[in-house]
Regions:
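Long amphipathic alpha-helical scaffold segments
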Residues: 89, 93-124, 238, 252-331, ...
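Short solvent-exposed coil/turn linkers within tandem alpha-helical repeat scaffolds
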Residues: 33, 37, 71-98, 108-116, ...
Length: 763
């Protein structure tokens, strides 16, 4: 998909206005530099030259200059708000995407130039489109969108791609394709956009219209093309507007997003009340078809979700919310001992108390559950137990349940002296195959370390149908001592995706890589960003940055000043958003904010909204997943202890650390905090109760573990208002356990402490 903004050359549009606030609040400390693979000065000069040629009506010459820049630098990045203050947080697209915006803008800037451009590219676009429609080749359709967006066939390709996305249940992709056909679905509520919230989805702006008078005031703006066209849309599309917007409403209905569907349906009824056509297998009034479909959707059965817990946070979208609630009344039905890890030499832990865990007992293990078997990665080995009784999964003679042994003793992995980061053990199961990073947890060696004697970390892939036999091509090892895998990969089809780090003498480089599962062969590897990290080459670093996968798009929180969306099929960066970083200062509490304890913090995605809590920023913020545009940031200043993004219930984002928080998913407002806040000063008392471990959302309830109790919150509705109330408490001490990570599968609740794995019967 082509990413967001229409980019008029060099007079590049500002990113969403609220991104200025995001950066203003985070510039009180020095901001370490983030380096990207940006386009060079020669290409930037050529882009300026193309604009001047266009102004002089030298159409063909201007077009050829831009096409030439794409040929030489199409994969490199360009800031869409070039020339603005650095504190405003640049937003980046590839040069190829930028060029599509330039060509699309010709429809308004120089219509004759658009005619000439289409004479050049339409024959190829037509050939690709006819072949794609005949064979169902979506790759060709995507090439039209990527490379020939402003051709006469760009809108037709988007229409068909959206249909394919709808068929597959990829509602985010379908919506974004159709929104690019016309500008109105991305417009604002005023002709000049001054009163619109740039980047915020249109339906969220429609929520402001609560009366006929309010609608009447904005109807002229809604009926006209938005001034300035802040979003990339097809120039001069001849497709029927009502039909396209009816499809957008259909997506909301199919997604069961009732609030958005009702707002968009009202918009459709007011702007196109009498339009008719074929939709959802019926012919007639678009409005009547959708009204009937929306009414019937209330009785649709929910799709049964998998009961497995296949990776960190349950799913690769990092937002699992099991349907079954929890009620344990007994002592554990079984337990197993776990490898014990501490943070006694971890530099951040020496400055300030850890968040939601203890220095002497790290909650390092994050098990997965697959086909009634529990798998645990202890870094030196992987173990498997039967969910029902805790017995070894395959070899009864081995009471430890070990299914893979790295051959590296725990003592060999212990770091001598101080270091950054702590050990985390994650796994991913996909189609009865298990993947994990084992061996050394260190991702960046100190400059003093001897790489020839230090053990390395590597990826294993185990065939669970063959009792843990290594898959062909595994283990996967990094290219050398300067390279490291970040953590457990995510899997899609025959492709394995994983974050990688490379260290030189100056900075650390964050990459995304794709390997073929059947051979272990590297398919592609793309540089995301380069930046200084806390160790600065003086201390070893342990990092564990996980990817988020949603319908063919990878989202990567680098914790190094950049968030990126990368297309899984080919490794193309679709957008990259930066934010000002904070510098960790060892030995100084004021330079060691609680947010630095965020380590297992992948992006959480829910219905097209990407929530991010980077470790090098005190902010929690949300981006639109399709475009990277900033939707909101949490501004209370109270949430820098958030280390776990637990999921979404209704329109509430639930997150936790030492406290438990509820935030408005669409605005970022802090709705509730439990318990009440205490002074955040280092010398102040910690909250009571205090979070201990990662909770979960199940059956619409929030389960928050503390040392002695699991607190259960339920959303109570009264007088058209909803509020989260403490519903009950599950006492842990009488059961002989303390708090820790929670996960659930069928009739078992697992609780993971620093040194034991407990299983309870979920009654």
């Amino acid at each position: 998909m082509v990413a967001c903004s229409l980019l008029a050359l060099c007079g590049l549009k500002m990113p969403p206005a609220n991104s200025q606030e995001l950066n203003r609040r985070t510039t009180s400390q020095s901001a370490p530099e983030v380096n990207l693979d940006q386009v060079g000065n020669i290409s930037l000069t050529l882009i300026h030259q193309a604009d001047r040629l266009l102004a002089d009506q030298q159409w063909d010459e201007a077009i050829e200059v831009v096409r030439g820049v794409v040929r030489t630098d199409g994969k490199r990045l360009i800031a869409v708000n070039a020339g603005k203050a650095k504190t405003e947080g640049p937003y980046y697209l590839t040069v190829q995407q930028y060029a599509q915006g330039w060509f699309a803008s010709l429809g308004q800037r120089a219509p004759e130039a658009l005619v000439r451009y289409r004479r050049q590219v339409d024959p190829l676009a037509r050939r690709w489109f006819i072949e794609a429609r005949k064979t169902g080749d979506r790759t060709l359709l995507q090439r039209i969108v990527d490379e020939l967006f402003a051709s006469s066939y760009g809108d037709d390709a988007l229409l068909l791609l959206g249909e394919y996305g709808l068929e597959e249940g990829d509602y985010t992709a379908a919506r974004f394709c159709w929104e690019q056909i016309f500008s109105q679905p991305r417009g604002g509520l005023a002709p000049d956009h001054q009163h619109a919230v740039h980047g915020r989805p249109f339906w969220m702006q429609l929520r402001l219209l609560n009366s006929n008078e309010a609608w009447a005031a904005v109807m002229p703006a809604l009926q006209a093309a938005p001034a300035g066209r802040p979003w990339l849309t097809c120039p001069n599309s001849d497709l029927e507007r009502a039909a396209i917007f009816a499809r957008l409403v259909l997506v909301s209905v199919m997604e069961r997003h009732e609030q958005r569907a009702r707002r968009e349906l009202e918009y459709l009824g007011r702007l196109y009340p009498g339009e008719q056509g074929r939709l959802a297998g019926r012919t007639g009034s678009y409005v009547k078809i959708l009204e009937d479909l929306l009414a019937r959707s209330a009785n649709w059965k929910q799709v049964a979700a998998s009961t497995d817990w296949s990776t960190f946070a349950g799913t690769v979208s990092r937002s699992a919310t099991p349907a079954r609630s929890i009620d344990i009344r007994h002592v554990p039905v079984w337990f197993q001992s776990l490898q014990h890890w501490t943070a006694e030499q971890e530099l951040m832990s020496l400055v300030r108390p850890r968040i939601a865990e203890d220095m002497q007992g790290l909650l390092s293990c994050f098990p997965v559950i697959h086909r009634q078997v529990v798998y645990v990665n202890e870094q030196t080995r992987i173990r498997a137990f039967q969910l029902q009784d805790g017995s070894p999964a395959w070899n009864p003679a081995d009471a430890t349940g070990t299914i893979f042994d790295s051959g590296i003793a725990r003592d060999q992995l212990l770091l001598e002296g101080k270091h950054f980061g702590v050990v985390r053990g994650t796994l991913t199961v996909h189609r009865n195959r298990l993947f994990a990073k084992v061996g050394s947890p260190v991702s960046v060696l100190s400059q003093r370390a001897d790489p020839l004697v230090h053990p390395t970390g590597y990826l294993v892939g185990l065939d669970l149908d063959a009792e843990g036999k290594l898959l062909p091509g595994f283990p996967l090892r990094p290219d050398g001592p300067d390279w490291a895998f970040e953590g457990a990969p995510v899997i899609d089809g025959n492709q394995l995706y994983v974050g990688m780090r490379r260290r030189d003498q100056v900075r650390s480089h964050a990459y995304l890589a794709c390997f073929e599962l059947d051979s272990g062969k590297l398919r592609w590897r793309v540089l995301i960003c380069s930046a200084e990290t806390p160790g600065q080459g003086q201390w070893p670093e342990i990092t564990h940055h996980l990817l988020t996968l949603d319908h063919g798009m990878l989202y990567y929180n680098t914790n190094a000043g950049a968030i990126a969306a990368v297309r899984a099929a080919d490794g193309d960066i679709r957008w990259l958003t930066t934010y000002p970083r904070r510098t960790f200062r060892a030995g100084a509490a004021e330079g060691a904010g609680r947010h630095f304890f965020r380590d297992l913090n992948p992006c959480l995605i829910h219905r097209g909204i990407l929530v991010v809590a980077p470790s090098d920023s005190q902010q929690v913020f949300a981006l639109e997943a399709a475009t990277g545009a900033l939707l909101w940031q949490e501004q209370s200043g109270k949430t820098d202890d958030i280390v776990h993004l637990l999921g979404v219930v209704g329109d509430d984002l639930v997150a936790s650390g030492d406290y438990l928080y509820w935030l408005d998913l669409y605005k970022g407002h802090l709705r509730r905090q439990f318990p009440d806040a205490v002074d955040n000063d280092l010398a102040a008392a910690r909250p009571d109760p205090r979070g201990l471990g990662r909770g979960l959302i199940a059956g619409g309830e929030v389960y928050w573990p503390t040392r002695e109790t699991i607190y259960v919150f339920r959303r109570e509705v009264a007088r058209d208002a909803a509020a989260w109330q403490l519903h009950r408490q599950i006492d842990l001490l009488p059961r002989g356990v303390s708090g820790g990570h929670l996960l659930i599968c069928n009739d078992r609740l697992l609780l993971v402490t620093a040194n034991r794995l407990f299983a309870f019967r979920n009654d």
